[in-house]
């Protein structure tokens, strides 16, 4: 009311009040855009958690405040509903992972009960909760938060934490069967296997860290806590195996269970099958080695068939829909299409809610889905559904039908994604807009012939109709109309302008508050203005008189770009496209890149590939550098332990034996090979290294005891097969719940470990003994027996294995020094 009584002075000196010449009313400005939820106008409240807080607790606090607000403050005619809830998404994910973790524990215990004698299974099973709970406590003390990354690490490492315990239990049973007392067998089993276990565990832990040094940006943030979590769990499991398990062995396993004549268990069947297979391999050594090489090469040929994507799609029970109309379209046109599409969505039974942003865009509600710079020709819908599966089903059903349903408009159906860039993006740089536009048009024409692509467009949009006003310098100066005053007057008469603010009183939580309300000046006559009316617009002169615009300026229509994009200071036009659902970028990208390389670009124009290809090109060297550093690190560990270049190189090359199973598994499951799958492969590398060390250490010790290379290799295979089978089985079944859960983020990791582990088990145990035999067939023993006073010191025990303390201490010490 006070604004209506403000006094104004006219050019002739008369005084009037605002309400004499204008109407003043309070209203929401809906001329540029507004929001609706389930067909009703609404306002949006968006909350974002401060860094360093617990998002689940944050969500609980918000729920408490909202419930209190509903009871005490919410008017009866106002409804409040939630569109997105990140705390709920995170809380559900954490709960699911905790469930999968417990299921994995149960599965591993059941597998051990099936494969082990009951007392041995009891001892090994105690390792799982003991190591997990101690590791979780250490993680808490170190400030490592519990989230889906750390929980996924716990599931991945769950089967591996029993590996060392299985090795110690197996050694204990062997020595116990050889006639030792329980205490002697417990001590001897730790002495025998501690250094190989320590070396293998340190190797596995170490290979995860180099990639942290090479990766950067969002990729590094996503995996930052993976290596320390793995390391803590494995090192704790090593301590448990070396300190706790021997005591449990003495207390629980009092004697070796005698075999019942005629009764055979699973490990007996596995051992018999393996003995026959290994004997055949030793009869055909070169065929075995050649066959393994052919198998690895063949799976390498299959590698390009994998679906590759840096980050997978998000598992969300919602999706977004974006509506694009030609530049210059009015809000009413956008509203009409939005209402029609909203009606279509609301008829779907699996849709639980639709929120429409007409002329505007939503706040950020997903980490990699940035708000769109909106206009009157844009609308966005957030569609909530019953489940993740319902979202995918609706996208598959509606996207092909309604993407181009409305003439002149494109409807983009957006599945939530972790990839922050367009899949297909190609840029042209140059100083001349017409030249870069010509290059972009050539590429778009080619891309529109590719059936897998849709919505091929540029970020310059389409040329829009403009009204160009050219001020006559002579006539305007005679009347005292400057360029600035003409611009201001035209802006006031053709649009609106904020000329100030007023403050209104209100209350929050029972306390008085004031809040700012913008004061906007606009001419209602301009709402229906046409092009012919622009000439008749009046401008005030320096003398106070008003003249029509046509008297001091020329008015002409023309087409022009509403925006000119610059990138790194250069004019740039980007051609982007969407891939149809179910398509992947690699083959299409290569075709487009080849076409760009053959394009006759205008003078002064250069091309650049962006989008997913650019992201992959940025991250791939970092990933390869990290893996390379890990391999070098492993090589030096092995070199200092075995003191032979040949055996260290064989171990590095043998890492490839895990690839056939992993690649075939991903192909059969039809899953994406992405950044998270990398940790599945690194885990597989660690499993292979552990088994290599156990096999080659045993073979070295047998040769040191006087066996030939062939006898030592054959005995190493036979003796280490069952422990390797048991450790691989527990690791593989540990990730089964992760596979069954079907998460797009973690299922490929589980498949890589499961399928790769099975393939690795078959190849490592059948090929490496043969390779070892051929490597040392004509050469000297890799570790000559240690002699005291010229007499060979024989080891006491069933395996007749001798340890060289000096060799053990020096090799490991130098290895640890290099690692530090």
What is the predicted function of each stretch?
Residues 1-103, 169, 444-630, 634, ...:
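Extracytoplasmic/periplasmic membrane-proximal domains and adjacent transmembrane bundles
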Residues 787-789, 808-811:
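Glycine-biased, low-complexity coil/linker segments
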Residues 83, 90, 94, 169, ...:
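Helix-loop junctions and hydrophobic alpha-helical segments within the transmembrane domains
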Residues 158-172, 193-214, 221-261, 381, ...:
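Transmembrane alpha-helices and their membrane-interface boundaries in multi-pass membrane transporters
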Residues 193, 247, 262-311, 718:
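Signature of alpha-helical transmembrane segments and their immediate interfacial
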Residues 1, 333-419, 474-495, 511:
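Solvent-exposed, membrane-proximal periplasmic/extracellular interface segments of envelope transport
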Residues 140, 211-222, 293-329, 739-745:
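Transmembrane helices with small-residue packing motifs
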Residues 106-173, 636-720, 725-742, 755, ...:
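Hydrophobic transmembrane alpha-helices and their membrane-interface caps
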């Amino acid at each position: 009311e006070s604004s209506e009584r403000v006094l104004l002075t006219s050019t002739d000196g008369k005084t009037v009040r605002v309400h004499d010449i204008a109407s003043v009313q309070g209203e929401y400005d809906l001329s540029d855009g507004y929001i609706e939820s389930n067909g009703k106008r609404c306002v949006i409240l968006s909350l974002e958690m401060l860094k360093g807080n617990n998002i689940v607790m944050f969500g609980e606090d918000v729920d408490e405040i909202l419930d209190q607000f509903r009871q005490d403050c919410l008017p009866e005619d106002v409804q409040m509903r939630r569109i997105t809830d990140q705390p709920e998404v995170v809380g559900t994910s954490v709960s699911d992972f905790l469930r999968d973790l417990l299921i994995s524990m149960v599965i591993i215990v059941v597998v051990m009960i099936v494969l082990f004698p009951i007392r041995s299974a009891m001892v090994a099973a105690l390792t799982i909760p003991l190591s997990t709970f101690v590791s979780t406590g250490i993680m808490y003390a170190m400030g490592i938060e519990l989230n889906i990354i750390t929980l996924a690490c716990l599931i991945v490492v769950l089967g591996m934490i029993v590996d060392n315990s299985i090795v110690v239990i197996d050694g204990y049973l062997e020595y116990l069967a050889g006639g030792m007392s329980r205490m002697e067998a417990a001590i001897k089993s730790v002495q025998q296997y501690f250094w190989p276990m320590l070396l293998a565990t340190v190797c596995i832990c170490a290979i995860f860290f180099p990639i942290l040094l090479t990766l950067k940006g969002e990729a590094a943030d996503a995996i930052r806590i993976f290596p320390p979590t793995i390391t803590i769990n494995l090192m704790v499991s090593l301590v448990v195996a070396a300190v706790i398990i021997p005591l449990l062995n003495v207390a629980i396993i009092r004697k070796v269970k005698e075999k019942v004549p005629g009764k055979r268990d699973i490990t007996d069947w596995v051992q018999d099958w393996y003995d026959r297979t290994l004997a055949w391999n030793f009869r055909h050594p070169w065929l075995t080695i050649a066959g393994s090489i052919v198998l690895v090469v063949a799976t390498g040929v299959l590698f390009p068939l994998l679906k590759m994507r840096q980050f997978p799609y998000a598992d969300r029970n919602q999706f977004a829909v974006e509506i694009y109309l030609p530049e210059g379209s009015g809000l009413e046109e956008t509203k009409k299409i939005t209402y029609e599409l909203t009606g279509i969505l609301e008829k779907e039974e699996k849709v639980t809610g639709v929120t429409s942003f007409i002329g505007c865009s939503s706040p950020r509600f997903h980490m990699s889905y940035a708000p769109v710079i909106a206009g009157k020709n844009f609308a966005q819908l957030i569609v909530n559904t019953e489940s993740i599966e319902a979202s995918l089903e609706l996208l598959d059903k509606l996207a092909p039908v309604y993407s181009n349903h409305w003439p002149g408009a494109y409807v983009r159906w957006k599945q939530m994604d972790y990839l922050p860039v367009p899949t297909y993006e190609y840029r042209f740089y140059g100083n001349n807009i017409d030249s870069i536009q010509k290059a972009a048009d050539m590429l778009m024409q080619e891309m529109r012939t590719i059936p897998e692509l849709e919505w091929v467009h540029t970020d310059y949009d389409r040329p829009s109709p403009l009204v160009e006003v050219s001020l006559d310098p002579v006539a305007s100066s005679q009347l005292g109309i400057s360029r600035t005053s003409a611009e201001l007057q035209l802006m006031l008469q053709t649009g609106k302008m904020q000329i100030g603010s007023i403050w209104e009183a209100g209350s929050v939580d029972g306390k008085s508050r004031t809040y700012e309300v913008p004061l906007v000046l606009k001419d209602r006559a301009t709402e229906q203005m046409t092009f012919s009316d622009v000439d008749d617009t009046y401008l005030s002169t320096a003398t106070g008189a008003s003249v029509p615009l046509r008297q001091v300026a020329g008015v002409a229509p023309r087409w022009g770009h509403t925006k000119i994009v610059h990138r790194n200071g250069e004019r740039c036009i980007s051609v982007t496209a969407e891939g149809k659902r179910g398509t992947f970028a690699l083959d299409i990208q290569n075709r487009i890149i080849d076409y760009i390389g053959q394009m006759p670009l205008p003078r002064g124009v250069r091309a650049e590939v962006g989008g997913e290809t650019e992201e992959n090109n940025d991250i791939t060297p970092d990933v390869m550098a990290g893996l390379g550093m890990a391999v070098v690190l492993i090589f030096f560990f092995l070199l200092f332990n075995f003191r032979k270049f040949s055996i260290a190189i064989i171990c590095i090359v043998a890492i490839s034996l895990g690839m056939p199973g992993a690649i075939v598994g991903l192909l059969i499951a039809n899953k994406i090979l992405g950044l998270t799958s990398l940790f599945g492969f690194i885990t597989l590398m660690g499993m292979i290294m552990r088994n290599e060390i156990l096999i080659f250490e045993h073979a070295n010790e047998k040769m040191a005891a006087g066996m030939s290379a062939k006898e030592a290799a054959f005995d190493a295979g036979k003796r280490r097969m069952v422990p390797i089978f048991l450790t691989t089985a527990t690791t593989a079944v540990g990730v089964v719940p992760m596979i069954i859960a079907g998460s797009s983020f973690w299922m490929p990791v589980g498949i890589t470990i499961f399928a790769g582990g099975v393939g690795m088990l078959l190849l490592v145990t059948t090929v490496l003994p043969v390779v070892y035999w051929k490597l040392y067939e004509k050469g000297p023993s890799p570790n000559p027996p240690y002699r005291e006073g010229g007499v060979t010191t024989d080891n006491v025990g069933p395996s007749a294995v001798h340890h060289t303390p000096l060799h053990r201490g020096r090799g490991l010490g130098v290895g640890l020094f290099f690692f530090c």
